[in-house]
Amino acid sequence: MTASQPARAEPAETVTNLTIGIQVVKPEGWHHLSAEANLDNLRRVGPDDKDFQEAVARYGNAPIIAFSKYVEPYADLNPSLKINIRPMGALAGRSGSAILQIILPGMAKLFSDMKIEQAPTETEMGGQQSGYARFSYTLKSGEMSLPTTSELWIVPKGNYFFMIGAGTRQDEANGTRAEIQSIISTINFDLQ
């Protein structure tokens, strides 16, 4: 394959993890994002400051499931969806929106221009109560500035919670929030 040829489109695929109880459909044409590619991408497009790089090293845990619209490395902001799982710990008993209220101020410290577009609110995902927030900021990668819209869902489930994040360009030129929403609509937590 030469650089001018597009990567072969991957077929749609249902991804199931019975151990943690989640199922989601990767759309046709989207790609699995490996843990290594995810970490490389975080380092490449994140702020160059020391605090961000330390946060990547500390919190850049590999997602349990991750999809991107384009094969990495990709020269622009690659629309993506990532699913992580975290222990509830001291957050036990809190709603998804309450957890978001705790998480977002830390994120705002990493991005000086971060703007909350949709404040944390309760919603439902895959039959589970969840919190949702949408925010925008600028990622910088070398000489590039990438105006970004991120969406974050927190789904509490017992002693842990799912953290589902998605990102697109603000102008949606190479991928849309509607595409992300179509993936979100396939998530299922009731696998029994």
Region annotations inferred by a language model:
Residues G96-I99, T148:
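"Short basic amphipathic alpha-helical interaction patches in structured regions
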Residues M1-L77, P87-G89, Q101-I102, G106-Q128, ...:
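N-terminal targeting sequences that direct proteins away from the cytosol to non-cytosolic compartments
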Residues E151-L152:
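Extracellular C-type lectin-like domains
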Residues P79-L81:
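Beta-strand acidic-aromatic groove motif in beta-rich domains, primarily in extracellular
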Residues N84-G96:
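Short histidine-centered catalytic/ligand-binding loop motif
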